[in-house]
């Protein structure tokens, strides 16, 4: 991980964020940012925080981010993040949300939470099926022109602001803020961006309110245009990433609606795309098709672990374990090594591929490592799961050492492999116990995405809770007061009944 950080820092664009390449395009490096946040969390490496904060700010303020409707575009065609390829992908937005929420968690800066909420609102409004599952993408073109849906002439822009009741001074100031000119910056029209951060623009509370009015009016006007085509396929692996992102946002930002969104999508995948022991890859027009790949099993399985952390419903852990066992059965090679990507049902392949490169999404093997090691730390099949994860790491050892920048998600999982995380168990007779609620609230808001914690109160399904190794012998009765256990490798300290003392010990 240190070598990866060093190499990323060598190519870091300290002025515009992101990482320089030989080509003109810049892609969102969200997985690299997640690795940097983990490294900063553990070692306080200030280079990591610099790369994260500079890049997130530059991307959010650039044309690559939809300043009116929210959501991140596929990539920028310039190094300033100004001119995007206007296609929007579910996975890009999921990873971006994760990076924003994690940045908020480690820095406490409220703007990251605001930006994450804005991106989630785009997903809720435009990318969520009535069933609760998430669509795959939105095209770049409408009416045969790339970006036509998103760009503005100065004339139309000012017309909308005037109709919204904004005075001349406010209109001119908003024009400057979003860098709108008569000449434009994209084929005579304007891609909106924020060249100067809001905090440096001299924006007071009144201007922020006027900006919100303008944004709402522009979004309403834009809704009259012909939208780009939406790809309404429901893909299991990509939904897994968004479920993980929303679960993280729900618990860290204390937004139950985000957790509900994640829960609805997870239930859809489980009930409609998992049947007779097979996870399917795609759902569209009422039909599931194609046996799932390693990426489908590992990313959806991992999302159930993230959903458990947000809901504390042990059913999600049980389901994650079931998927992990199916994954091992379907994709583990005969000899120790990395898992196959293609399902055994795909008979037309002469050789089953093995993939470790973390491209636009984490590789199936990277996500499989996280699923296996997290379940092992929860106490399930610990020796077997750790051994399998170690075999995957061994297979990619040379690639990780030679080119760690191509494997940021896999590098991130080295923390799970070589560092034994602390484990936490909180129990109470009632979910309304004030000490219990305070303990749970701290764990959800402050713990990183790899934290191992369980909780149980006497009002939940105790049969399911009894299946959690960390709760063995600790199932509460109605009369019991709250207790917090701090453990390592399943060995626990004396239970702590006071929430404030518990928070001091774990902070």
Task: Please name every model-derived segment.
Residues 1-507:
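Glycan-recognition and catalytic cores of secretory/periplasmic carbohydrate-active enzymes
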């Amino acid at each position: 991980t240190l070598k990866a950080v060093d190499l990323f820092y060598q190519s870091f664009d300290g002025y515009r964020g992101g990482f320089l390449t030989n080509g003109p395009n810049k892609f969102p490096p969200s997985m690299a940012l997640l690795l940097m946040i983990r490294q900063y969390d553990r070692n306080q490496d200030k280079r990591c925080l610099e790369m994260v904060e500079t890049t997130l700010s530059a991307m959010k303020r650039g044309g690559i981010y939809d300043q009116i409707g929210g959501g991140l575009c596929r990539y920028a065609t310039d190094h300033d993040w100004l001119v995007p390829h206007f296609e929007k992908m579910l996975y890009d937005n999921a990873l971006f949300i994760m990076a924003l929420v994690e940045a908020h968690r480690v820095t406490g800066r409220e703007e990251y939470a605001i930006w994450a909420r804005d991106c989630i609102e785009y997903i809720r409004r435009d990318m969520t099926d009535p069933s609760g599952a998430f669509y795959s993408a939105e095209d770049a073109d409408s009416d045969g022109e790339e970006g036509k849906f998103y760009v503005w002439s100065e004339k139309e822009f000012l017309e909308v602001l005037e109709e919204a009741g904004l005075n001349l001074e406010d209109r001119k100031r908003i024009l400057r803020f979003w860098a709108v000119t008569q000449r434009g910056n994209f084929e005579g029209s304007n891609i909106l961006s924020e060249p100067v951060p809001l905090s440096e623009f001299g924006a007071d509370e009144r201007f922020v309110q006027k900006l919100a009015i303008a944004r709402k009016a522009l979004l309403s006007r834009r809704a009259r245009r012909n939208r780009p085509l939406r790809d309404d396929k429901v893909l299991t692996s990509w939904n897994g990433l968004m479920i993980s992102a929303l679960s993280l946002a729900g618990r860290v930002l204390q937004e139950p609606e985000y957790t509900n969104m994640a829960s609805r999508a997870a239930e859809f995948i489980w009930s409609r795309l998992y049947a007779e022991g097979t996870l399917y890859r795609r759902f569209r027009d009422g039909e599931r098709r194609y046996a799932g790949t390693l990426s489908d099993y590992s990313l959806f399985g991992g999302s159930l672990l993230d959903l458990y952390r947000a809901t504390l419903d042990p059913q999600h852990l049980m389901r994650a374990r079931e998927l992990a066992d199916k994954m091992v059965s379907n994709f583990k090679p005969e000899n120790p090594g990395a898992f196959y990507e293609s399902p055994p049902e795909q008979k037309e392949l002469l050789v089953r591929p093995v993939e470790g490169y973390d491209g636009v999404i984490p590789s199936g093997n990277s996500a499989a490592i996280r699923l296996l090691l997290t379940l092992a730390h929860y106490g399930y099949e610990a020796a077997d799961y750790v051994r399998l994860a170690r075999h995957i790491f061994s297979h990619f050892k040379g690639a990780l050492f030679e080119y760690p920048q191509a494997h940021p998600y896999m590098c991130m999982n080295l923390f799970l492999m070589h560092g034994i995380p602390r484990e936490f168990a909180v129990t109470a007779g009632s979910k309304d116990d004030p000490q219990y609620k305070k303990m749970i609230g701290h764990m959800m808001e402050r713990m990183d995405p790899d934290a191992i914690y369980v909780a149980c109160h006497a009002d939940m399904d105790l049969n399911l809770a009894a299946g959690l190794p960390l709760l063995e012998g600790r199932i509460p009765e109605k009369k019991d007061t709250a207790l917090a256990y701090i453990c390592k490798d399943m060995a626990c300290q004396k239970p702590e009944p006071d929430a404030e003392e518990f928070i001091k010990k774990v902070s």
